[in-house]
Swiss-Prot record:
Probable ubiquitin-protein ligase involved in the degradation-related ubiquitination of histones. Contributes to the post-translational regulation of histone protein levels by polyubiquitination of excess histones for subsequent degradation. Residues 127-338 are annotated as: TRIAD supradomain. This is E3 ubiquitin-protein ligase dbl4. It catalyses: [E2 ubiquitin-conjugating enzyme]-S-ubiquitinyl-L-cysteine + [acceptor protein]-L-lysine = [E2 ubiquitin-conjugating enzyme]-L-cysteine + [acceptor protein]-N(6)-ubiquitinyl-L-lysine. Its main location: cytoplasm. Its EC number is 2.3.2.31. A zinc finger (RING-type) spans 131-178, 291-320. It comes from Schizosaccharomyces pombe (strain 972 / ATCC 24843). Belongs to the RBR family. Pathway: Protein modification; protein ubiquitination. Zn(2+) 3 binds at residues 217, 222, 244, 246. Zn(2+) 6 binds at residues 317, 320, 327, 334.
């Protein structure tokens, strides 16, 4: 990236290093074409719950960036620095850039901080003067960007280093009132090699961060990005799950781990609810009741059944929830369970408790599959040892015992899917579509438990070949049940069949 704006760098041809990471999907190659961002995109027939995406390397990102700048400089008479500044200001939206620039070229350049021509080469010069930052005087090395605001070289370098350390890739002139962006050529003249390398990595990141169709893989130390053209507006009808070359699977829309079949808006609501409710929900359910008048949660801290709500001062009976005025002097016993006022209060509380019990039903199953998925991760180590032992006990090669690891892989995927089916089901309105969804959910859950049990128990009751065939058959079946559930849910999202109890 150090030669980002050199002509030779722009003209250099890169091999197509785009790698397909959709190894978990059944797909068929068709003709390839070039998209608007310069990436090679292969059109494929995919499952209903899959989306088109590409994994791109830093090398490809830089090639695409250079190509975009080259294309625009051939249309409008600007330097590469100015085109780069415009692109970054308009978030790499070519159409919006051209529209605004054609309508108001000078204003667009000024807002982008590249209004001044960058054709003049900036050099460090020595002369008598005073630095306006440190106020050193004498014959000093001075430097200025395209705006000609001059400061001593040491201060300029320190200023750039501090901005880069703060993660900034668009750096304005040190002059307080100046909006001019310091060009890449100018920064190259001032910084040492180590600082320049950090700056160029920031440029790479900004290209992805500012582009709606690109997202960095969230895996630690992974340098791949994902290119996907699913828009934010469509996230209520599609779950754009992608898989990086490093193996990380995540949602392109929100960046969370794969949460199919639940759409991103529901994921956000569910996670917030879990954070707010789950830690205390069980305790509340067991130890508290709600005021029949204002519904404030109340904990009983003594033996007396005469309760007074601290919030609204309403007096009621802890046992039957009726007004205390109807209880006379029977402070520690209650025989008025069938009174109309008590029944009404209990009905109100019953609805509230039913809502809490419904939430706990879905949350407990959500949490159970999350815990099971973590245990399946531990199963990998056990599986590796078991695969090694299989080779010792038979004449199978390492490739031939991969069926066991593949089974654990699909188990983990299905646990993740099942976990999120409960979040999705919690927000579904009850109708025929919900019944079908729960049938598919039940079938997948049963298939997963059968495969999990088979993988964990020793194969003492049958030969290795029979055991292998059983695992292969159940793995295929589990994968097919997952596809059925996800495909049906995805089609329902696309067709608008799902109805929710919350607004999304």
């Amino acid at each position: 990236m150090s030669d980002l704006l050199d002509d030779e760098f722009y003209e250099e041809e890169f091999e197509n290093d785009l790698l397909d990471a959709s190894e978990f999907e059944d797909e068929f190659d068709e003709d390839a074409e070039i998209d608007d961002d310069g990436f090679t995109v292969e059109r494929k027939r995919r499952r209903a719950h899959s989306v088109s995406y590409r994994v791109v390397s830093v090398r490809d990102l830089r090639a695409s960036l250079n190509e975009k700048i080259n294309q625009l400089t051939s249309i409008i008479d600007l330097t590469r620095e100015q085109v780069l500044g415009l692109y970054r200001y308009f978030k790499w939206n070519r159409e919006r850039l051209l529209e605004r620039y054609i309508d108001a070229p000078e204003e667009s350049l000024q807002k982008a901080g590249v209004g001044l021509s960058g054709s003049k080469q900036r050099e460090v010069v020595h002369h008598e003067g005073t630095c306006e930052i440190c106020y050193d005087e004498g014959c000093l090395p001075f430097f200025s960007a395209e705006c000609d605001h001059e400061f001593c070289l040491a201060c300029y370098r320190q200023y750039l280093d501090s901005r880069i350390s703060e993660g900034e890739s668009v750096i304005q002139c040190p002059e307080e009132s100046c909006t001019q962006i310091v060009s890449i050529q100018s920064i190259t003249k001032v910084l040492d090699e180590k600082s320049l390398d950090r700056y160029h990595r920031l440029l790479d990141r900004s290209f992805v961060d500012d582009n709606d169709h690109l997202r960095w893989c969230p895996a630690p130390d992974c340098e791949f990005a994902i290119e996907c053209h699913v828009t934010q507006a469509s996230l209520s009808s599609v779950v754009p799950t992608v898989t990086c070359n490093c193996g990380k699977q995540f949602c392109f829309g929100c960046g969370h781990d794969n949460h199919q079949p639940t759409i991103c808006p529901l994921v956000k609501i569910w996670l917030q609810k879990c954070q707010d409710d789950s830690e205390t929900a069980n305790w509340i359910h067991a130890n508290t009741k709600e005021c029949p008048k204002c519904s404030t949660t109340i904990e009983k801290n003594g033996g007396c059944n005469h309760m007074t709500c601290k919030k609204c001062k309403y007096e009621f009976c802890w046992v039957c929830l009726g007004p205390w005025t109807e209880h006379g002097n029977n402070w520690y016993t209650c025989n008025r369970y069938e009174e109309k006022s008590s029944t009404s209060a209990r009905d109100s509380q019953s609805k509230s408790r039913a809502s809490l019990e419904r939430y706990l039903h879905y949350y407990n199953r959500f949490a159970n599959h999350e815990q099971s998925a973590k245990l399946d991760h531990e199963l990998y180590e056990h599986t590796h040892k078991r695969m090694t032992q299989m080779q010792v006990d038979s004449n199978l090669s390492w490739v031939e015992v991969q069926f066991l690891k593949n089974a654990v892989d699909i188990l983990f995927q299905c646990r993740q899917t099942l976990k999120w089916t409960y979040a999705f089901a919690y927000y579904l309105a009850r109708n025929n579509q919900t019944e079908i969804f729960e049938d598919n959910q039940r079938d997948l859950e049963l298939a997963v438990e059968n495969l999990s049990e088979l993988c964990e128990r020793p194969c003492q009751d049958c030969s290795l070949s029979v055991f292998k065939q059983r695992v292969l058959d159940k793995t295929v079946y589990v994968r097919s049940r997952r596809d059925v559930l996800l495909d049906d849910t995805a089609r329902g999202l696309a067709e608008g069949r799902w109805e929710y109890v919350v607004d999304v």
